[in-house]
Amino acid sequence: MRRSDKGELLMAASVTVQLTDWLRGLSSKLMQAEVRLHNASVIDPDMAVIFAANHFTRIETLLLPCILQEHMGLTPGSLVPAALFRGRVGKYLKASGTVSADEVNEDTTVVRMLLRGGHPWIVFTDHPAHPNSKRGQDNVLGGLPPQADGLPHEEAAALAIRAAYCRGRFRAPQRRESQEEVTRTLRRFGLESTEEVDARRTVIIPLNITYYPIRLRDNLFMRAAEHLGRHANAQALSEISVQGSVLDETIEIDISFGEPLDIGAFLNRPEHTPVMACTFRAAAELESDPDGPFQRAARALAREIRDAIRAEVTVNLDHLFAGLVLEQPEGRLFKERDYRERLFLCYLQAQKKARRLHPDLKAQCLALLHDEELPAFRELLRIAVEKRYMLASEWGYRVSPERLRPLPGSLVIAAGTARDTVLREFEAAHVRSTLCRYAAWAPDFVVKAYLRRYLVRQDLREFEKDYACFYHPRDCKPPEVGQPFLLCPWRIRGGVVLAHGYMAAPMEVRALAEHLRRRGFAVYGVRLQGHGTAPEDLAQQQWENWYASVVRGYAIMRTLTDNIVIGGFSTGGCLALLAAARKKKSFSGVFSICAPLYVRNYSIRLVPSIISMNALLKRFGQSHYARDFVENDPENKHINYTRNPLTGVRQLTAIMHATAGALSDIEIPALVIQASQDPTVDPSSGPDIFAHLGTRQKQYSLFERDRHGIINGEGSPEIFAQVEQFLLRTARELSSRKYWLFGRRLGQTLSRLFVHRHRTGQGSEGGSAAEDLEIKTNNY
């Protein structure tokens, strides 16, 4: 054997080993991926099925058959473009039973199987605009007439129409064709007699596959593909770069089945009756006519397939962010907070208009609205800036003039656009214009007003629902006691999120809120979950639900002002301190009034044991001996519950421990107020809170009071004045800092402007820079 032959054999063996490892890794990734099937029950045994799927990368040719076989027990055939049947990948596809569109007779393979009621088929077709598509060599729309859409599912539509037409003609009780013509047509499809044609319906099932997340970057798959050498074309390399990103990490795959499109019923529509009226001989001639009834029906069916696939998309955060970037007006600056609010607005629109949402989308958009850190959002921002879809500056984000202009109607990525897959997918989903256009173009004050109204209404609806569910004349106070409230002055100096105490209601802090509103502060009185209704409602709550109520209050106040102080009375003070520790950059200050780290009633330590005993008694059917509530004698009987659930006491203990551990993380100005003779909260709680605060800007005020509820009744105006002074001081400091930051940024911009003019010596360029400075200043 010649040395060159040995070298070629060694190289071929090396490529084979590498490809085998790639395929083995691919299978491993597919097994690890989380796959969710939606609406799979539409598949019926009496159907002859063609699956028409959205097609972004060649990975679907391997992915879909594996998933359908593993999760549904189906063994579909696959008809794929000939461009993929090259090199070792082509050999693997042939070995797995996949059929090349150019190397097979579709009549004797696909249509024959459909007529006999065999296994279903997945038809993968090249988009006509692809450079590797034979149909795209003559016309960018695939050789179709100029009025055609150039849709990627025309081949699947044509096969389905051919199968439905032949089934209808073969099974018709009276045919106009001669027996010789029938026999010749049967032979065309590899059939012996009309008895082989069963009575199943020919249907196309739209199938949408959505990946989440897709983080596009260089990957091992792309490097492995380079070993394919001359067998890998540009389109394959472009798509493999996406495939590697798709399966380079834990991926979630949503596969949604649309409602079956009955091709027989489609052909019985008045506009398509000429198709079914044709004889076999006439049909063969009309099928080759691009303006004939067969081609018109195929194009109409392809459009229906396209729309059905788009309707089944599983909308996720990548979709919403991509659509928002695409719709962001040129020249308009968006801050990070703008993206957060507008993404939540997109989510609200998606709830109304999209058929299916990713299961994590609601939690992600709520986290964005609450200004919580979300790695997925941070990664999307980074990718958008890195790929130059957006230009980042200290003023905000501006859309790049070079941003992607999507191709209308494309369901498949074009060569060289692997990095744009997320945007292509969103464009193909046809949710961009309906979901994101309003959110991107609406003025800031409109977005904030809409979100504020929505969030306040949600809080009120939740209260009304809980109040109606747990209503009891003995325990429930009037609705106005438990309703959350929003108070706004004419001119807002700042905002306050105000939380009430344990077993109380928003009415408890209403007097303080009214005082602060008269001093120019907007106040949102939070209703902690389980409060303001009945003790049975409180007994079912966890302290995390109380914290979530406070965070929702922050989101509401954030639509009014950036200067937000959080505060609370008693347990509400603990929640305020905890929120200030966790959301360090969200608040300008925090205050607590009689917040408990310790309580005077030492019997609270017995509560866990009593709860365990209650559970044991209920387990053995002795629930009448269990004691779930204890009597409570509150100061404000018109507000507080008169029965205290023991499970609520356990949650109170948990929130006190959580607060004690978070005090050192508080880095914003803080005010701690304590009553010297508090009969409920141990007075040592105030000094201990003050001592463990992480901030240096802190104040401790001790008032000579022998009551716990010092924010109502005698002596409360002094408490109000103390809180007011703290808020005014915090507002002044924040205002001074804003002016200082603005001056520094303005100085930096002027410095760059003067340096630029000095270097260029051209007044015109200086004038252009000055105009740019004016635009930035106005946007700020």
Feature roles, as predicted:
Residues 1-77, 81-479, 515, 733-738, ...:
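Membrane-interfacial terminal anchoring regions of lipid-handling membrane enzymes
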